[in-house]
Amino acid sequence: MERLADFPISICGAGALGANLTETLARCGAKNLTVIDRDRIEEVNLSTQPYELDEVGVMKATSLSRMLYRAVGSEVVAVTKELNERNVRKFLKSAELVVDCFDNSRSRALVTDYCGKNQLDCLHVGMADGFAEVIWNEQYRVPSDRQDDICDYPLARNLVSLAVAVASETVLKFLADGTRENWSITLKDLTITPMVLT
């Protein structure tokens, strides 16, 4: 998809959702990606994020940028600062699509407000215990602080993978024809049926 290669996308958060989504989009051909995250890789991240053991202590955004350059030649811009009221314009001004994958309500509220006020397309991807959402800014409601830390839940890589697959497909459809779909993913209710071959 030619539009994907040049379209400026900023991904907020390089944790389980953001890192895997950035990797998926880069491997699909996205070449104009920025990832914003102030955190360093911790050993606990290795089960759900595409980082390696010898990278513990490295900035997540920096590691992701290096990995994707080595893997597919994608030059992801790594922003290793905390997104806040003073710098949100600076870090999001070049984006035409923002994907919010932050794991806290304060940062999600900042992205929601900024994108709403500036009429900037924004897709929110989030998850909790057995449940994930992919929602465009117009319908999105920032979760309460009680639901903040994704690490409070029994985080499963399979739910991360499903959420990232749905989010990346949502981004690709949006870039192809402007389609804006909202999704909820409930792991418990997911049905996979056997294929009967005759």
What are these regions (language model features)?
Residues M1-T198:
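Adenine nucleotide-associated cytosolic modules
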